[in-house]
């Protein structure tokens, strides 16, 4: 549906900036179609979960100027909606027998508890790399604004997501004996798409791949 909607757009009517966005979307959708069909976000947890948004990503960012810093604050404001949406889609996945393994759920829970257990002053979302050209007073003011967003919007939403994982997902988490993707609804199709992606053969079957491995 997204691809057909994108194709229906008259690119000649777009501005140069919009054409760049259109091209990027076209590439992203065409190259990641199978991944989008997998809907892995419905059961992502552990290393394939979403805790990186809280723990890692901001530490990799470089803020060159005050305008970029202000845009980053706006990005942080969207985290409330992000984690609300994550909780919602994973609840949909749960209702459709698409749930993470218990092992990965416990990893996510541990990561979220550690995040929420850290003081506001030590929140990883504050660990941004600012340009030396940005004044210390500006950085201090930026961090105070960020802490308000984190305290009022992000942490309560993350806590709600954590409680959902504990109460709803853990009781239905897949055991180690059922850790493979084949054990979730739609898992066989997901596995076949992965085979096509990584082998380059459109019509390959699971049996054929296993026979290659045994030969």
Q: Where are each of the predicted segments found?
A:
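N-terminal maturation segment of proteins
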Residues: 1-215
């Amino acid at each position: 549906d997204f691809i057909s909607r994108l194709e229906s757009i008259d690119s000649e009517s777009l501005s140069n900036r919009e054409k760049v966005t259109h091209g990027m979307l076209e590439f992203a959708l065409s190259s990641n179609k199978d991944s989008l069909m997998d809907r892995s976000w419905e059961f992502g947890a552990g290393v394939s979960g979403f805790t990186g948004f809280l723990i890692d990503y901001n530490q990799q960012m470089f803020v060159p100027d005050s305008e970029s810093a202000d845009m980053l604050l706006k990005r942080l404001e969207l985290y409330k909606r992000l984690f609300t949406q994550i909780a919602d889609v994973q609840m949909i996945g749960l209702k459709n027998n698409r749930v993470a393994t218990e092992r990965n759920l416990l990893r996510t829970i541990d990561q979220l508890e550690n995040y929420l257990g850290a003081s506001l002053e030590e929140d990883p979302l504050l660990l941004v790399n600012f340009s030396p050209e940005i004044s210390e007073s500006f950085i201090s003011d930026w961090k105070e604004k960020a802490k308000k967003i984190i305290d009022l919007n992000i942490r309560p939403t993350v806590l709600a997501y954590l409680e959902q994982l504990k109460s709803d997902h853990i009781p239905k988490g897949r055991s180690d004996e059922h850790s493979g993707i084949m054990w979730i609804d739609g898992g066989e199709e997901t596995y076949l798409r992965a085979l096509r992606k990584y082998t380059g053969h459109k019509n390959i079957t699971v049996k054929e791949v296993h026979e290659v491995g045994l030969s």
